[in-house]
Amino acid sequence: QLHEVSADCGLLRRINVLDILYQNDLHRYTAKAYQPQAKDDEPRTTDILHLNDVDPLPASMADEYPLFEAGDLAVSIRKVDLVFVFDPDTGTVKWHTSDPLIMQHDPDFMGDGWIGIFDNNRNFMKRGRMLEGSRIVAVQPHTDSVDIRFPTPLSDPFYTDTQGKWQPLPNGNMP
């Protein structure tokens, strides 16, 4: 569930993410949580989604995202390799992707219509060699574009089996 809280910690709203998936015909993704052969985990009967990040679209950036409005939420659901943006007032999913992600985290609105995502790109070897490591993936929903921002051809690969956070530095680099 997503909880919206006030500045004084009062609960303003509760949103059931499974309801959002069902209302938008995205519930088919939940089947991935029950396919342990695709990952090294047991089938899930609890925490089938593993919601790991929510990022609201700030009003200052909203004009750069033609499909979205200020206050729309970017949501990452790791267990089913899904990122989507939805209107929390109506429950309408405006965009979603699961490709090219594997157990991702941390979608952030970057500006110029791009959403940056920390893609664990997890594989069963737990060393990252099979799929060439983790990545920072940028997607531009209104053009259906995908760009691997990091690693670059000039950088070393990196890998994190679980979790993960990214942020662009003021000079444009990514740690």
Identify the residue ranges that each predicted region occupies.
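Histidine-/acidic-rich catalytic cores in large beta-rich domains
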Residues: Q1-P175
